[in-house]
Amino acid sequence: GAIAEQVSPEEVRLKVNLILQQHRNIRKILKLDLTREANFPTLTCVCSVDASLTIRECHQIASQLENQIEKALHHLGRVTVILKPSKQNRN
């Protein structure tokens, strides 16, 4: 059966939070949006990352996280991870 299993939004948020928090470059999860698009759940995450990361690194990390989330939650139609460099410096 190709029926998409129903996963509660709470469970999605929990799993996504875990995946994002495990990544060393993620500073803070700013937004987690779960919407339905053409009957597919669509997830958008906005996270702050270290300001020292290059744009290329941000893209690589975002793709990596999107893949991880898609693997963990097969029922999601689309996963988008947006990384925003955080202005705060550590020093």
Regions found by a protein language model. Name each.
Residues 1-91:
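Alpha-helical transmembrane segments and adjacent TM-loop junctions that form the membrane-embedded core
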